[in-house]
Design a protein with these regions (language model features):
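Acidic, surface-exposed loops and disordered segments
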Residues: 1-170
Length: 170
């Protein structure tokens, strides 16, 4: 898949088939995420991956209660922010966002679906990730991605809005 096509057609999937996600696919996703740009080349991230059914079911309760996507997902990836690894202080959220976008685009390219679940600054979700995935206190759970083969088809739609573009000055 070409990069522009991947960007324009990526969608957030919340329903997944009962189909495996392989270790090789997960490794490729992590490699893509870790190749994201970061301020000062700090790469201030750690990743927690689970394919354990009990943990995925627990995430459905502890992180996103009432949402069935974790019960259908075959895997989940949590990106954690490590402030001690920031190349330049204060840019860790941007760095982790770049890694998250790479992960989502790589998943799309491989025919997998995911959705970005915001964790940072949402205390109940942060606590849920710490509880289920054993995240240490010095790490900051940033974003969580249920992962699987999509069980729905979502049409690509243009999101370009020329009224939000300002040339030379506002």
């Amino acid at each position: 898949m070409e990069t522009i096509q991947a960007i324009m057609t990526r969608r957030s999937f919340r329903a997944f088939k009962d189909a495996p996600v392989t270790e090789e696919q997960i490794k490729t996703l992590l490699e893509a995420a870790m190749n994201a740009p970061s301020a000062g080349d700090g790469r201030p991230w750690h990743f927690v991956v689970t394919t354990d059914r009990a943990q995925l079911d627990a995430l459905a309760v502890e992180v996103d209660e009432g949402n069935e996507m974790f019960k259908q997902a075959q895997a989940a990836v949590l990106i954690c922010l490590d402030r001690l690894l920031e190349g330049f202080g204060g840019f860790g959220e941007q760095d982790c966002s770049c890694a998250a976008q790479n992960l989502q685009l790589a998943a799309h390219d491989m025919g997998l679906g995911t959705v970005w679940i915001a964790i940072i600054n949402v205390p109940p979700r942060t606590a849920g990730c710490r509880k289920v995935l054993g995240v240490p206190d010095e790490q900051i759970p940033f974003a969580l991605f249920p992962l699987g083969v999509p069980d729905e088809e979502l049409e690509a739609e243009t999101r370009f809005d020329e009224s939000r573009v300002h040339i030379d000055r506002w």
